[in-house]
């Protein structure tokens, strides 16, 4: 069984204008910073987790004043209590931190991460204080890139040396805004507590279509943690048509756990598959893989992942490069479109 505690409310924030927070110990487990002379701002209440420009800027899409959001790092703090319970595993998970992030819990450094749309997590079972207050501190920054290739300042837009994998041009994912460089925590921050047995969020699903693309062999692989060594667990996989809910295949694999973290694999055969296609060539048929981990009659954990069957080929020679989707020619149109330069404004 697992319990998810979403750390959504109660966040506080400050901007570390001199970038001295690590030296002065802003990550320490304490209720308030009472130091004098550091010129560090007071903690302010943060109403929600999203890009900071969307919260604090009067006009978040243009203007020189936006540059101050990236001149110095930001520190986030929240406090939470964890029920006094017996757990086999505890994971702290972030879905989005834009862009560089360092994380501390109860004054202890957990690690760091870079990348704004890649979830990351830490095992914190031995770091939590059960039944008492816990302190989570995160340092976040998305600095400007200053160096330009060959010092060609008149071509800065295309020749700036990129230290971050973000933005089609300099820092923006849409139009070319000189002063927009999104920064902040958004999405979900959650603590996942496991009493016994939990499936990882990430599922590795692959398939092979037969020559007439009417049947498919589906291969599902995932990891489970928090298992009890020597116990027997059932790993069940159902493949459904997403639109109708019809079960197309089902299989259960039984395994005896040798350690707390164990991998599960399952192979299924699906008949009469419906192929995903673009709107102008057919219909985007979707499927769902439902994964369930149980011990005896007790369901411990479940996950669902969406996927589609399709056959993609590429034809390439000296004269042409051509794509085929489900045995039909496909013309690849534009990509990399974002309706907003702040991803947190789209969710």
Question: Where do the language-model regions lie?
Answer:
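An acidic-aromatic loop/edge-strand motif
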Residues: 7, 17, 46-52, 62-65, ...
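Aromatic-lined ligand-binding clefts that engage carbohydrates, nucleic acids, or primary amines
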Residues: 69-72, 80-106, 136-138, 233-236
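N-terminal carbohydrate-binding accessory modules
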Residues: 290-347
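Conserved, mostly hydrophobic/aromatic
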Residues: 107, 189, 287, 327
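Beta-strand-rich ligand-recognition modules
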Residues: 105-155, 256-278, 343, 347
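Beta-strand-rich binding/interaction modules
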Residues: 105, 215-255
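Short, aromatic- and glycine-rich surface loops/edge beta-strands on solvent-exposed regions
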Residues: 135-138, 283-295
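Extended carbohydrate-recognition surfaces in non-catalytic/accessory domains of CAZymes
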Residues: 1-93, 165-187, 194-195, 317
């Amino acid at each position: 069984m697992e319990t998810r505690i979403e750390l959504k409310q109660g966040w506080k924030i400050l901007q570390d204008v001199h970038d001295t927070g690590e030296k002065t110990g802003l990550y320490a487990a304490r209720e308030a910073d009472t130091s004098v002379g550091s010129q560090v701002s007071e903690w302010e209440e943060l109403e929600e987790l999203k890009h900071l420009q969307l919260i604090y800027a009067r006009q978040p899409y243009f203007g020189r004043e936006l540059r101050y959001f990236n001149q110095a790092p930001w520190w986030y703090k929240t406090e939470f209590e964890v029920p006094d319970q017996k757990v086999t595993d505890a994971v702290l998970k972030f879905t989005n931190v834009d862009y560089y992030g360092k994380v501390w819990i109860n004054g202890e450094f957990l690690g760091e991460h870079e990348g704004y749309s890649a979830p990351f997590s830490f095992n914190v079972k031995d770091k939590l204080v059960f039944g008492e207050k816990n302190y989570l501190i995160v340092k976040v920054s998305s600095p400007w890139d200053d160096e330009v290739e060959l010092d060609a300042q008149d071509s800065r837009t295309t020749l700036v040396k990129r230290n971050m994998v973000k933005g089609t041009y300099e820092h923006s994912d849409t139009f070319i805004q000189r002063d927009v460089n999104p920064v902040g925590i958004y999405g979900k921050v959650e603590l996942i507590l496991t009493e016994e047995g939990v499936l990882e969020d990430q599922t590795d699903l692959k398939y092979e279509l037969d020559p007439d693309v009417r049947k498919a062999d589906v291969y599902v692989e995932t990891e489970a943690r928090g298992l009890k060594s020597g116990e027997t667990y059932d790993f069940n996989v159902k493949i459904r048509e997403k639109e109708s809910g019809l079960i197309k295949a089902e299989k259960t694999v039984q395994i005896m756990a040798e350690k707390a973290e164990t991998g599960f694999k399952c192979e299924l055969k699906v008949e009469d598959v419906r192929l995903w296609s673009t709107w102008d060539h057919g219909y985007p048929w979707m499927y769902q893989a439902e994964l369930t981990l149980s011990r005896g009659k007790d369901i411990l954990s479940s996950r669902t992942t969406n996927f589609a069957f399709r056959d993609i080929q590429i034809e390439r020679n000296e004269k042409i490069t051509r794509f085929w989707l489900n045995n039909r020619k496909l013309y690849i149109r534009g990509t990399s479109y974002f309706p907003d330069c702040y991803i947190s404004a789209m969710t």
